[in-house]
Amino acid sequence: MKLLKPTWVNHNGKPIFSVDIHPDGTKFATGGQGQDSGKVVIWNMSPVLQEDDEKDENIPKMLCQMDNHLACVNCVRWSNSGMYLASGGDDKLIMVWKRATYIGPSTVFGSSGKLANVEQWRCVSILRNHSGDVMDVAWSPHDAWLASCSVDNTVVIWNAVKFPEILATLRGHSGLVKGLTWDPVGKYIASQADDRSLKVWRTLDWQLETSITKPFDECGGTTHVLRLSWSPDGHYLVSAHAMNNSGPTAQIIEREGWKTNMDFVGHRKAVTVVKFNPKIFKKKQKNGSSAKPSCPYCCCAVGSKDRSLSVWLTCLKRPLVVIHELFDKSIMDISWTLNGLGILVCSMDGSVAFLDFSQDELGDPLSEEEKSRIHQSTYGKSLAIMTEAQLSTAVIENPEMLKYQRRQQQQQLDQKSAATREMGSATSVAGVVNGESLEDIRKNLLKKQVETRTADGRRRITPLCIAQLDTGDFSTAFFNSIPLSGSLAGTMLSSHSSPQLLPLDSSTPNSFGASKPCTEPVVAASARPAGDSVNKDSMNATSTPAALSPSVLTTPSKIEPMKAFDSRFTERSKATPGAPALTSMTPTAVERLKEQNLVKELRPRDLLESSSDSDEKVPLAKASSLSKRKLELEVETVEKKKKGRPRKDSRLMPVSLSVQSPAALTAEKEAMCLSAPALALKLPIPSPQRAFTLQVSSDPSMYIEVENEVTVVGGVKLSRLKCNREGKEWETVLTSRILTAAGSCDVVCVACEKRMLSVFSTCGRRLLSPILLPSPISTLHCTGSYVMALTAAATLSVWDVHRQVVVVKEESLHSILAGSDMTVSQILLTQHGIPVMNLSDGKAYCFNPSLSTWNLVSDKQDSLAQCADFRSSLPSQDAMLCSGPLAIIQGRTSNSGRQAARLFSVPHVVQQETTLAYLENQVAAALTLQSSHEYRHWLLVYARYLVNEGFEYRLREICKDLLGPVHYSTGSQWESTVVGLRKRELLKELLPVIGQNLRFQRLFTECQEQLDILRDK
């Protein structure tokens, strides 16, 4: 054995409370007290191991120093992969560090340039939950969890895959928790506290397995830490500070029955730290060959307040070596090298000691295969503790399952090789970043410098900071980084997780109500029918550019046809009638229209009075009693306008639908919020215009022109309808004035006075006799062969004019508007004739013709979207751009909710439940909207999440429904298709998803065999 105390490892005389050696053995970290802050220092291991390297001035001893902790650092621990370093301190924080390969060294802050950081380490996540000093941190054996304990009497389990998510908070100690340790396979975690107890917790459900108190009855809270340790074979757990016959010991606790019959004795004062060697050894004979009946044993180091260190072998009754007065103060921490032959010890006196053993002294270490067999004999092969490596060695019973597994492994190898190439190209100083050399990047930055001339002609150049370029070694472990105010934080994924996905921009407003709801919606402007146009802002916010609504424009009576597409007259919307996306008119726009004399002041009128210029009168039953309570808003327009091109600021903006309110008007000029009265609903009626033009679509080019009150022979006035499609024009005349128009690539329809609705083909042929509406028209829409009419009485009808069938028959909006001050802000008619109403409160309802019910398909205030997290279940980035009616309705609201949820800790169980509920809502909404590609997308995401989380019952139910009966039965109610998709084809798409998890290979085999039987039939 060799003993060394490197004097250059110090914290400038301050205490060192923790030490840990990197898994690759090239460096080690120390944590302790700094100058007015906590200090974490990363040191080079080579000068400790080799005397020549220590003397070589070209070999740096200190690699990096971090002073980010606000108070003393009590513990530093490397992850088992060596990628991350966790540190906990008296500032109640746990910081997770990761190396960042910058170009060139930097100096330590406050060192006047004397100390240089050879390596750059940055804090990638700050974990905040403890209310007291953090005493110890520990990574689980497979880096899936990070545990921390504190003087607040709690142990917190963090999800190391998704920092800062908290999986569990273990409460049970009544004193300061000062030590943590995991068992070798991560099945248990043990904690020791000042309440004279040691508790063992199960990781399966995070519940208490056992509490051991007898060996600690005589103990007092005299130690700064209580670092206990679990043996690498899993058989023994050794505690810190215990007492036996009033003498300090390290208590040995057997896993079998948690018996406490043995202990390590000999120290004169309380034991502060126990650390097992990571290797399991077997005895070595003198001739160099291992003994045949060799029994494996472990090695353990014990440190005490008596400043001495003892090293024990479990095959010996006495310690292998004892070193007295190794330090001037208490031993605080111990760390073994990964090969098991070296040990670092730190003390409160601010010094470090290194002990180097030989194999002759400790024995021959067992191989990893032999170590794994010992673990299996101790813990078994429970799926609850099986790692990915163990699953990969499991027996695969199906050759198709093997094919999917090999394909998945090949994808992982391709990703790793790509990441390796990126890291290799970033190591050289003259490397390339994104296809551009670093020198070129610096030159391009210099080109952007700002140069000005002073009054006397001298040049003045504004200094430009050229930051050091961070070129590596960032792996795909990070999904996203969300900056926190005043701190550095980020979310982290393991290197085995799904490929990195680009987060959607949550700042983009929702095309279907994602922006702030208008609290004061206005009625339709007289210059155009309500709800028939879309402004540029709403088009930019729409997630699918192929689904926009037509544009209505107000023009002089004699407008030239092609000028309808000029930017001076229209908003150049690339509209198709498939899915209108409307926005509300703001009060500012209303005031601007009033200033241009395009809109007169609003005035109340009797509810039961017919619309202006209508020849039909409604009988007045109780006019005297109702006239004071029921009001109607009428908007009139000034027909005397200047000839020629309208002013730029006088263009009309899209207007939202609003529902009539029974409340009395307090001021005529005040914009009113119209709500649904208890007795009746009243929607605004478009006023007749002299002329207007409607752009139906841009591809193919199609627009409609309407001209009212065209004088013919004999003084008779008619209305003219013109349609131009790709240069081919047709026109027809009607006897009544046209109030509003709509069109699609299949039909053109107009609503006239006297409640008449006329439908024409795109060639001008009348398809139906005029339809008499139950009340005056309010809004008209067309999609394909479907025509939707929303009347002033808030009744909705949808017809399929080609098949001449009714889809929705005079359905009232009372059920979705009654009882509150809500307004209809936007309307959508899907390609399958499903009407969707988006309300001002952010909720969207669609009418289900099969059930004759209004179904909720979207809610902007949905809390499920804020907690749901299914990033790992998304197949690719392209899948996130799934378009359709559901995507238009919801926009990007759900993504912003998930981004916001990352800033707050959500328990894993709660997040699991909310994610399942959210995905099931998405599948049901896509089914209700009859959107086949969205239904397929969300079904695959839902199934992938079930596979990842291990929900076999729900997954099996989905497979059973998609498979159907194998043998045909006349009484079977099973439908072979869903929203136009074949169920069994969907099941074939699910099989590769199921095949990614070996736990479901039985389900995979069952489904595949039954599909083969059906195929043979």
Swiss-Prot record:
> Bias category Polar residues: which stretches?
536-555
Q: Which residues form the signal peptide?
A: none
Region (Interaction with CCNA1) residue spans? 421-729
Consult the record and explain the modifications the protein receives after translation.
Sumoylated. Phosphorylated by CDK2/CCNA1 and CDK2/CCNE1 on Thr-555 in vitro. Also phosphorylated on Thr-555 and Ser-687 in vivo.
Segments of skewed composition (Low complexity): 494-509
Its Gene Ontology cellular component terms are: chromatin; extracellular exosome; HIR complex; nucleoplasm; nucleus; PML body; protein-containing complex
Against Gene3D superfamilies, the record matches this protein to:
YVTN repeat-like/Quinoprotein amine dehydrogenase
Under which name does UniProt file this protein? Answer: Protein HIRA
**Where are the residues of the annotated region Interaction with histone H2B?**
593-826
Residues modified to Phosphothreonine: 555, 576, 586
Q: Which organism is it from?
A: Homo sapiens
Q: Which UniProt keywords apply?
A: Chromatin regulator, Nucleus, Phosphoprotein, Repeat, Repressor, Transcription, Transcription regulation, Ubl conjugation, WD repeat
